[in-house]
A protein has these predicted regions:
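Short, ordered secondary-structure scaffold segments
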Residues: 2-74, 82-85, 96, 107-115, ...
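Flexible glycan-contacting loops in extracellular carbohydrate-active proteins
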Residues: 94-100
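Conserved hydrophobic/aromatic "anchor" residues
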Residues: 3-5, 102, 121, 128
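A short acidic/small-residue loop/turn micro-motif
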Residues: 66-68, 77, 89-90, 122, ...
Length: 140
């Protein structure tokens, strides 16, 4: 899978090399961390979803344009994905509509990590995989 991002973060283009498909995600009214809604399109058909976030900014539910639940997500306090449910309450094995979840960041589901932009975070270890490049007080 290959992903492209717009300069302002309002559009993601996801190219799936396995099935040769392309998906466009438009963040409406903000970027991936603040938008209240998204429009997902394959270039022909499109679907509007509203993003429901918790106090950390994690996307915990997506609803369609009629207010029906499309996907519900549950995270532990460290960002580990506990459960994903579809509209009927069936358990899914991964995030299906949007790969952003904990604190609005991108989940790299094949390896179980979260891309926090500057560093990768492992929710199972509760640790970042790289040191912080910006250390304010190195002697403390």
């Amino acid at each position: 899978m290959l992903k492209h991002y717009s300069h302002d973060g309002s559009v993601e283009i996801v190219c799936n090399k396995t099935d040769n498909s392309t998906k466009f995600v438009f963040y409406l009214g903000g970027d991936a961390y603040s938008a209240p809604a998204i429009l997902i399109s394959d270039g022909e058909a499109s679907k509007l979803y509203y993003l429901h976030r918790d106090y950390l900014g994690s996307i915990v539910m997506l609803t369609d344009e009629n207010g029906n639940i499309a996907e519900r997500r549950y995270f532990d306090p460290w960002g580990q994905l506990i459960k994903v449910e579809d509209a009927a309450g069936n358990t899914l094995d991964k995030l299906t509509l949007l790969d952003r979840g904990f604190t609005g960041h991108e989940h790299l589901q094949t390896v179980g990590l979260i891309n926090m932009n500057a560093r990768l975070y492992d929710p199972a270890l509760h640790r970042f995989l790289q040191p912080d490049n910006y250390v304010q007080e190195p002697l403390k």
